[in-house]
A protein has these predicted regions:
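Active-site anion-handling motifs in enzyme catalytic cores
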Residues: 1-310
């Protein structure tokens, strides 16, 4: 079988790149004849994953010669980012349907879709999909309300088998730009880090440079102003580099969903920063300490983080 994979790939987003790698490995193990991934950086994707790749607007020839289109994972079918984004990912699906190809939806979070047109187009496409797996109950409930069957699955990154090195004395901090990550939040977070980890090495982990770098550099500067000097910012952010860096930590304080997953899988003591319901749910499922962006005091959750493991 020849497969085309459509996702948010080539943008150096750690979670989406990890899912693309897991999916391509799965397809190879099942004997796929050819895998082509649609990417914003086809050359890099091809080199990193050992597959064929085509540009975001040059997918049609690959779809025409394929047997199956796989759309996912991630949150592709939503218009919270933009209506244009939803239309693009639907256009890929509709192209496959028009040319008589099988369509599978892989481990996606569906919605929110606010526009009536977006809902109609998404519903029409998904009713024609061969198989749909979703990563959360909310997505499954939405599809159920549309009378579309789906299977609930765990996020693919949870399937990774990771080394558990956990070097003592190293703390990883992963932040992203977000409306609640303001000076007040960063100062409170820095105070707790200085209080608990002044004697440890601090590594700041920007997992998507275009979004994470500015706040990462700002937080590093705040820590230096508070007297913490053993700080570095991870420069290499390839999939392997990030996994190795997180696996090597004693502690991890992280916002991004997939950073928290890697911490969990690598056996790192992890504190989650809640900016998205999926992070809150993950923390609840794995009993992680959790701080909210608007919490007045972080001390109780940091106490939980520093408790010895049973």
């Amino acid at each position: 079988m020849k497969y085309v994979v459509s996702g948010y790939i080539g943008f150096d987003n750690f979670g989406d790149e990890a899912i693309a790698k897991i999916l391509s490995q799965k397809l190879k193990s099942e004997g796929a004849e050819k895998i082509t991934i649609i990417s914003s950086n086809p050359e890099k994707t091809s080199d990193n994953l050992g597959v064929c790749s085509c540009g975001m607007l040059k997918f049609l020839p690959s779809i025409i010669e394929s047997d199956v289109l796989i759309s996912g994972g991630g949150s592709l079918l939503q218009d919270a980012t933009s209506f244009k984004s939803l239309v693009y990912y639907l256009a890929v699906i509709y192209s496959a349907l028009i040319f008589g190809k099988k369509v599978e939806i892989f481990a996606q979070g569906i919605g929110p879709i606010k526009s009536k047109l977006g809902q109609f187009l998404t519903k029409f496409a998904l009713k024609r999909a061969l198989k749909i797996t979703v990563r959360d109950e909310k997505s499954q409930e939405l599809l159920k309300s549309w009378k579309i069957d789906s299977e609930l699955v765990k996020d693919p990154v949870l399937e990774l088998e990771l080394p558990q090195k956990n070097s003592r004395g190293t703390v990883g901090i992963q932040l992203r730009n977000y409306k609640g990550v303001d000076d007040s939040f960063l100062q409170k977070l820095a105070d707790e880090v200085c209080k608990r980890f002044a004697d440890k090495k601090i590594i700041i982990l920007p997992l998507q440079k275009s979004i994470d770098t500015e706040v990462s550099e700002k937080f590093a500067q705040i820590l230096r102003e508070k007297g913490i000097n053993n700080i570095s910012i991870l420069e290499k952010t390839s999939l392997t580099d990030v996994i190795d860096a997180i696996s090597d930590l004693e502690y991890l304080i992280a916002m991004r969903f997939h950073a928290n997953i890697v911490g969990i899988k690598a056996g790192v003591k992890t504190l989650a920063i809640n900016y998205d319901p999926k992070v809150e749910k993950l923390a609840s499922e794995y009993n992680l300490p959790l701080i909210n962006l608007d919490d007045k005091d972080f001390s109780e959750e940091f106490e939980r983080l520093c408790l010895p493991l049973n």
